[in-house]
Each structure stands twice: as C-alpha cells, then as structure tokens.
From Swiss-Prot:
This is Aminopeptidase Q. Residues 2-13 are cytoplasmic. Keywords: Aminopeptidase, Developmental protein, Glycoprotein, Hydrolase, Membrane, Metal-binding, Metalloprotease, Protease, Signal-anchor, Transmembrane, Transmembrane helix, Zinc. The record marks Y505 as: Transition state stabilizer. Changing A139N: Associated with atypical swirled coat pattern. The active site is at E417, Y505. Metalloprotease which may be important for placentation by regulating biological activity of key peptides at the embryo-maternal interface. Involved in coat pigmentation patterns. During skin development, may be required to establish the periodicity of tabby markings, initiating a pre-pattern at or before hair follicle development. The gene is LVRN. InterPro entries: Aminopeptidase_N-like_N, Aminopeptidase_N-like_N_sf, ERAP1-like_C_dom, M1_APN-typ, Peptidase_M1, Peptidase_M1_aminopeptidases, Peptidase_M1_dom, Peptidase_M4/M1_CTD_sf.
Amino acid sequence: MGPPSSSGFYVSRAVALLLAALAAALLLALAVLAALYGRCARVQPSDLHHSGVPDAASSPRGTQEEPLPTWPPRPTREPAGTATPGHWRPPGPWDQLRLPPWLVPLHYELELWPRLRPNEFQSPTLSFTGRVNITVRCAAATARLLLHSLFLDCESAEVRGPLSSGPRDGALGRVPVDDVWFAFDMQYMVLELGATLQPGSRYELQLSFSGLVYRDLREGLFFSIYTDQGERRALLASQMEPTFARSVFPCFDEPALKATFNITIIHHPSYGALSNMPKLGQSEKRDVNGSVWTVTTFSTTPHMPTYLVALAICDYDHVSRTERGQEIRIWARKDAIANGNAAFALNITGPIFSFLEDLFNISYPLPKTDIIALPTFDNSAMENWGLLIFDESLLLMQPNDQVTDKKAVISFILSHEIGHQWFGNLVTMNWWNDIWLKEGFASYFEFGVINYFNPKFRRNEVFFSNILHHVLSEDHALVSRAVSLKVENFTETSEINELFDLFTYNKGASLARMLSSFLNENVFISALKSYLKTFSYSNAEQDDLWRHFQMVVDNQSKILLPAPVKSIMDRWTHQSGFPVITLNVSTGAMKQEPFYLGKVQNQTLLTHNDTWIVPILWIKNGITQSLVWLDKSSEIFPEMQVSDSDHDWVILNLNMTGYYRVNYDKVGWKKLKQQLEKDPKAIPVIHRLQMIDDAFSLSKNNYVEIETALDLTKYLAEEDEIIVWYAVLVNLVTKDLVFDVNNYDMYPLLKKYLLKRLISIWNMYSTVIRENVAALQDDYLALVALEKLFETACWLGLEDCLQLSRELFKNWTNHPENEIPYPIKSVVLCYGVAFGSDEEWDFLLNMYSNKTKEEERIQLTYAMSCSKDPWILHRYLEYAVTAAPFTFNETNIMEVVAESEVGRYIVKDFLINNWQAVSERYGTQSLVNLMYIIGRTISTDLQITELQQFFGNMLEEHQKLTVRAKLQTIKNKNLENKKRNARMTAWLRKNT
C-alpha cells in the first residue's frame, strides 16, 4: 500500500474500475440514445429489409445498417394506440397534419378482400387483406414518401418507375424501398427509398396490407348484424368520410388529391358486392384452404377524392327504375323490398336528379346510382358517388309511417345527398376548413327541391323550424366557431371530425339563403352554374366561389352592392356569431352589435372586426320595401321612421332571410304588439314567428326586457298557425321552467293565461287526432309542432288533453296494433306511465324487450322514467345498472330519470350505495352529468359545497377541479332564472 496523497483525493483500484465501467456504460447509453433519437414507432412489414431511420434530409440512403429498436405493439382502435408520445423521431413532414406536396396521385388499382362468411360473424372483428397500386406524379425530388395509413399492417411495399409514357405505362425500373415506418399520431406511412424520385416522372407504389373490420364501428370498413326473413345475417359496408379511407387502404387521404379508381372486391359467393361504378366482370379464386371466393371488378371511376370511395357486401334485394338513361337501384333487406318499403324513395330519387341536372345545367356523370339502406348507420346518410349509403330508418317507409314526418324526412335527406353529387363530389372543397361549401349548399337546396315538387310547401316556415331556429339558438360570438376556418388552425385529425356540426350545415345553409335573397335567385343560380362548370372534377376554395359570384354581378346592372361579394360574405363566414340589428322607429337610426350570451359588456372581449355588411330587406305596413345595407356600426334611414298612427309599423329581415336577430326601440315593439292584437293576419306567418323568436331570445340575453316578449303573446287566442304556437312554447315553456316551476307561484298563473289562449288551437288539432288523424300526413309543420302543443296542454292540466292521452294509451295497451299517432306518441306514453301503475310500466318494459329499432327503444326508455312511484323508479335504476334487459349502447337511464321532479331525489339516494356500479356501467362522466342535472335547483354556495361533498368520493381528481366552476355557473344561471321567473310572475298577475 502506498502513502496517501498530500492533496486531492484517493481512489482505490476497485472504485476506479467501477467508475471506468460506469463511464463506458454512460457513453454507450448516449450513443444508443443518439442513434435512436428521432425513431418513430414502426410496424415491420413481413417481407421488407429494414435498417435504421436516416437523418431528415431528403437524400438516398447509405448502405450502413444500424441496430433496430424493439418493435412496438401494433395499433388498435383504442385511442391510446394511435399516439406515439413515447417514441422519438426527428422533426419532419410527418409532424404536420397536411401531406407534403411531393407526390400527386393519379390512379388507384385497389383490391379488397374482407373475410366475411355466412354464419361466421360471432366475433366483434373479422380480418381483411388488400393490395393497392397507386400511380403518382412526382412534383418535387424526394427519397422519402409519405401517405396516409391507419390501423393497417404493411405486408410488402415496392416502388416501380419511372413509368414510360407509352400506352401500356411500362416501368423502366424499380426504386429500392429500404424501410417502412409509421407516424401513428399523424396517421402516416413513411417509405424510405434507396434513390431519389425525379420531378415530372410517374411512379407506381405497390402496397400489400391487412387489417381488421370492426362490428358496428361505422368507420372505414365495418360489418353489421341484422335479421331478415327470420334469420340473422351480416353485411359489410364502408364510411370513408372524412379521414377513414386511410384505415381501409394506404392512400393520399386529402380531398384535393383526386384520382381515378379501379376497384376489385373479393367476397363470398353467397353475397353480392357494390361499389361506386357498375360491375365490370366476375371471376373466381380459391384461398389457401381451397374455398372458392368471387372476384368482382368495377369500372373506372371519375376523378374523385378518397373519402368518396365506397363498397358494400351484402345479401340484399333491390328495386330499380331508369331516369334519363341512368339506372337507379335501392337495396335493402329482402323483407323490406318485398313489403314495398323502398317504393317512396325510389319514386322520388329520379325526379330529384333530373331537377338538379336542369337547375345546374350539368348532367349527372355516372351511369348508375345505387342507394343502400343499412339496418343502422350512425352517419344518417353518405353521398358516395354512385353508392349512397343510408340508415334504413331515413330511407324506407313502414306501414305505420303514414302519419309521421317520415316522407318529408326521406325527401330532405335524399335531396341533400343527391345535391352533394354536384356540391362535394363534382366540385370538392380544397380542404376540410371549407367543408361548408358542400354541406351548406346541399342543406340549402333541400328546400328548393321539395318546394319544386310541392308548391304548397311552406319553405320559409320550414326553413325556420328545421335550420334557423336551432343554429341561432347556439351561435354567438366569443364561444361559437366561424363557418370557414384557416387551415393553419388545424393540428390534429380529430379536429376535422368536429367540423360536422350545426355551423357547417345550418349556418352554411342560412348564409347561402341570405346570399340568394340579396342577389335574387337568378343571379344566385347563374353564379353557381359558372362555379360548378369551372371546377368540375376539381377542387375549389371559398374565394373561388366569391369570384364567380362577382363575375355574374359585374355582368349585370340591376343589382348594386355596397362592396365586393368577397368583402360582404367573408365577414359572415370568417367571423363567429351574428349581429343584432336594432331600429329606432322614431328616428330611423339603425345600429348593429354582436350577439352575446347575456349581452357581454366588457369591450375588451370583442374582436377588432365585429361588424358585418348587413343586407336589410324589410316591410312597412305589409308592403315590401327596397333593399338597404348597413355596412357600418350605425346609420340613419329616414324612410324607416313611423308616424303616431296605429297603422304604421315596420318589420326588418323579410322572410327571415338575413342571418341576424332584430330588435326595436320600445315604440317599435309597441307598434307590432298593437298590430298583432288588432289584426294578426296583416303580419305574415313567418314574421309572427320571427317576432316571437327574436323577442324571447333577446330578452333571455338582456337585450330587451322579458315583458316586451310576453306582451307579444297577448293576441294568441287569435293565432291558428301551429308553427307560431311552436315558437311561443319552445321559448316560453322551457325545460328549465318546467323543472323549477313548482318553486314559484307562476304555475297557476301561467296555466290560466296560456289555456285561455291555447284552447282554440287545441280544439282544432285534438279533433283531427280523434276523427281524421290521416289528414295530418301532408301537414309537415303540424307534425313538427304538435308534440310540443300536446305536451304543454297536458302539463298545464288541460283535462281534455289528459283524457285523450288516457284513451289513446289504453286503446294501445289493449290492442297494440292500434298505434298511437306518431307526433304525440312520446307524450301519450309518458302520461300513460305517470298516471298508471306497475302494470302499465311492465307493459312498456315488455314492449321494449320486443323492439329492435333503437328509436323506438329510446322512446320507451324515456316514457318509463315518467313514473311518479318511487319504488318503480328505484327498480328502473337497478335494471339500468345490471343492464338487464337494457342494452349498453342506449340512453343513460340514470340521467333520464334524474330529469324528472321525483326522479332526481330517487337518483341521489340510489347513488349513495350504487355509485361504483353506475360508474362502471356509464363512466365517471355520467356522474358529472348527474351532478349537473341534480344541481339545477341550487342557488347558494352552501348547496354547491353539499353537492360537491356528496359526489366527492365518486369523481376522479381532474373532474373535481372543474366541477365547482361548473356548479357556480349553474347557480348563477339559476339565480338569473329566479329573477326572470319573478318578473314573469308579476307580469302574469297583471295580465291574467
């Protein structure tokens, strides 16, 4: 042993060796981390040679191999499997939502082989294999290819080319594929090449793949089980929109990347196959077990985006007809076809096609149209070119559908999907941020189509009930989104799915309608013809549409606009919300301001550009006036001043074609109230609707006093239009009011006030129900509004309503073939249970067990919650938790029961001992929803604390953090409702 050092520190040999080993290990670890840095999660193709991921530079691969990491598990349909936060990869184009512009797809040769066999569909999944050859044109030199792929296993990948320019497109060579890996979070397949693709050259990507088909998932490929002719059967279908094609085959899954498709489907011989185009031929092939399969090939499609690729494999029958040389077939269950359920849809489909062909002066380009009715289809309907897919409840007429709105619903949806053959299929938006260009216009033309075939159809009133009322109730600045969004605002694929909402469809349709109203229909259609012709088989952006409108406007002199079409319409599509237009009839002063919930006063919350260029169509004393424009925050229009005469009044927003609310000064509202009481018919129905809807919405949000809205209801004894009554009742007798009304003296006053006015319209329709209910089948507005009228009359205790409910319910329970009239069935079932015993409740339970349609089962689910017997409701909750006989996918029974006055206390008591079972059955989010429902009556901080303590053990930590804020919001809303209800009660005392 040597002497110690006089300075520093001493390290023994053993420690030195240990430190050296640790240092070496650290260096090795750093080297491995450096090598692995940037690696994305990969799925190893079975027959591909793999080596490490190169740097991000777009250059050919070297020959040096690197050690491979452990392969991660293959993706599943579980959300957690699609993200790769734990896997490293270098930054690159796979981090972007949009594909890089390196390749342009020209043509797909697609073969799909789902292993669907008769009587072999007990599993929740089945497998499929496929091959796709994609001809692409190289637009930028690259040694790396990106295309979309999700939940697919790549079996092989080759790149051939460049292709010769001859007629046979022969390959001049092959480009080595060194590696294939997947960026799961952005849903990309990445091919690393051994050579660089050259700009201007064409190549063919040859990919083999496999995946799973899920039962009832309704995304990509899915299969469904149904009953037909007494037997359980299966079918397979597709839903590619918006981004599910990539889960069926690797592809360039963006709407602007259109291509032609040759599709081949391999299927069991007992099934038939459908796709976008007519069948070209059939052959046979054997699988490895020697089983024979049918190979069906289809003709080449026009240029179209991947989201329109469609297929179905089924054992269905069909009915057909020919319209202008085009074959139209409707496919459905054999029972449904034999019973004639598809006849109505078949009879109107051809004429709708012909009408739109003539309107746009562009022929439908496909030789056939197949429409298939699936037993269930969550998307309602899909417009795939040549193969439209529907939920059968929205396409097929049942014998008991005569006194329903089913004919109108089928007509609306068929018109919408057929409208897409031009808006969306022929001309496609460049990207999903402008999805309203297809959905908004398809929704708008629903009404034009139906109005053409039924001139008595009340287009304005129906547009209000179906479109405008709903979207104006939900749209407001600060919270709602704009119709057209910036592409750069999107970062995740899931955000695309969120665009299929009220603003895309309803607001888009409303803006199209407003545009048509201030241009006139001829100019509107001329511009659309030009737009559709120019961009046929191509893509367009919103600015392209405005450009064609401007061209048509510039070529005429009758219509003068205060600004270019783009300047006018961009305000409406790029800004969220809508304006409130206020007119002072004494001075003619008009102003606009954004509509905010609760009329936000904090100006710092407002956007810098919070005005619109507003078209004002208006009437004075019943006479239509010239269009004026409000293109600034305020302006004076002397022509809108009114005199002191009782006969002088003004209404803005003719036919409710403008997308805004209208307010008046006190004199203006008083003039309209006086006119309603003197001669309501002098004001058109659509404007009686408008005044009621605007006044109540404005009062709810503090723009006018509630008394102003209530004053407009005094005349209602003279109102015989049920759609106006509908507007009154949905605004006045709200769910919150019904839920809380027993806490106030309002109910007896409201009962007396409304029944005095409602009795006339009630007598009219109750007589029809008793004596000639079939007369309602062509009265769409009555079918829409009757349920609310009936529900309110019974809630107010109108004895004739209660008696009619008892009669209809008893007649049905004694003879189930005597159907309760559909428009009021939910109300009759509810009151039948409410005034019945366990015998009536058990009857509904038995009916529920024998029903197969989800719509009918949900209706019965709600009705059974109407019982007023605590023990029955408690038993109902036990059934709900044990799931027998209730299926998991249906309505959350706990929440339904909690909605009733009796039920909310039963649910609260039930949760004390059963919250774990409720959480397992419905999820912890349901507990949050239940807390909000039960909390509808809270009005103090102490009640909030008590409710939080009650639910404290049931909620997850992250939910507890947000719950108190939500309960505080509910409390504030309840306090506002109390103030509002107190003022309503005071007004009713004076006017009853």
